Regions:
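Active-site core of bacterial EAL-family cyclic-dinucleotide phosphodiesterase domains
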Residues: 140-173
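Short regulatory alpha-helical segment in sensory/regulatory domains of signaling proteins that mediates
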Residues: 35, 120, 149-153
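Core hydrophobic beta-sheet residues of small sensory/regulatory alpha/beta domains
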Residues: 3-5, 129
Length: 173
């Protein structure tokens, strides 16, 4: 089983600027595109907001997960015609493969979400397959954030200012 976890890039901005009716229309068009990308036996779901998931049972006649993810990203990036406007959106996709990553559905969803986060931090409009090093990266980031919060609470930071000097007049700007 392969799980594709899909999140639209910048959807909140679209909703905020063009309104929820436009956002809802885009979501309906997106759902239709995802159904067309889906293979026989796939389940397409919308867990909430602008997130979608596709559960793909790997069959001998299936396309490769890489080919499916590529098709998803390309299909989602095609323009949407809504209310006389032509809108362009992109998506980030996280992919978790059961045989490689785990067998438990909750863990697969977590892994796909971690991979989705990596796709977003790597520049969006992309897909990433989960690998265990992603967990290490997230743990290191959490450790750093915790250390900074603790250092702030203990007053361990000192601020030093470097003046900006005008070289001609030798005066501080």
């Amino acid at each position: 089983v392969v799980l594709f976890f899909i999140d639209l890039d910048g959807f909140k901005r679209l909703n905020d600027t063009l309104g929820h009716p436009t956002g809802d229309a885009v979501l309906r068009l997106l759902a239709e595109r995802l159904r067309r990308c889906a293979q026989e036996g796939d389940t397409v779901a919308r867990p909430g907001g602008d997130e979608f998931a596709i559960v793909h049972p790997v069959l001998s006649t299936s396309k490769s997960p890489t080919a499916i993810a590529t098709e998803l990203v390309r299909s989602i990036a095609r323009p949407y015609d809504v209310g006389g406007s032509r809108l362009t959106l992109t998506a980030s996709v996280g992919v978790s493969v059961a045989a490689q990553d785990c067998q438990e559905p909750d863990r697969m969803l977590k892994n796909a979400d971690v991979a989705l986060y990596r796709a977003k931090t790597d520049g969006r409009n992309a897909f990433r397959f989960y690998d265990a090093s992603m967990d290490n990266h997230l743990e290191a980031k959490r450790d750093l954030e915790r250390a900074v919060r603790n250092a702030l609470a203990r007053g361990e930071f000192e601020v030093h200012y470097q003046p900006i000097v005008d070289v001609r007049s030798e005066r501080t700007c």
